[in-house]
């Protein structure tokens, strides 16, 4: 049986196993600007919060899961989303209705 949106929202935390060492049952909001790296030339996947961060990455995965998609993308504003759509998704000759 397919899960409804309410059930998906309720159980996403459990499915991702995102509990931490402090007993939290929900994913934390990371408010840091920069991230440490294990060594020179090695990255944890996050460099600078304006480009990417664990909180936005988790929210995007959860939105994709709730909507039944394979991926989701977060932008800082509606205008940024429109820009991304026009310059990265659309091809020459496509039409946009706004």
Which sequence ranges carry the predicted segments?
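Solvent-exposed alpha-helices and their adjacent loops that cap or buttress functional pockets
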Residues: 21-24, 64-66, 88-89
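Conserved N-terminal alpha-helix of the aminotransferase class I/II PLP-enzyme fold
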Residues: 34-83
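Conserved PLP-anchoring active-site segment centered on the Schiff-base-forming lysine
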Residues: 88-98
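Structural motif
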Residues: 28-29, 71-73, 94-95
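Short conserved active-site loop signatures built around small residues
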Residues: 1-29
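Generic recognition of cysteine residues
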Residues: 9, 18-19, 56, 90-92
């Amino acid at each position: 049986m397919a899960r409804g949106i309410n059930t998906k929202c309720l159980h996403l935390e459990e499915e991702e196993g995102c509990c931490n060492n402090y007993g939290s049952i929900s994913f934390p909001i990371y408010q840091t600007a920069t991230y440490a790296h294990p060594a020179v030339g090695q990255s944890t996947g996050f460099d600078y919060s304006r480009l990417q961060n664990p909180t936005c990455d988790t929210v995007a995965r959860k939105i994709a899961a709730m909507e039944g998609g394979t991926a989701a993308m977060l932008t800082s504003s509606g205008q940024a989303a429109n820009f991304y759509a026009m310059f990265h998704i659309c091809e020459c000759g496509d039409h946009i209705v706004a």
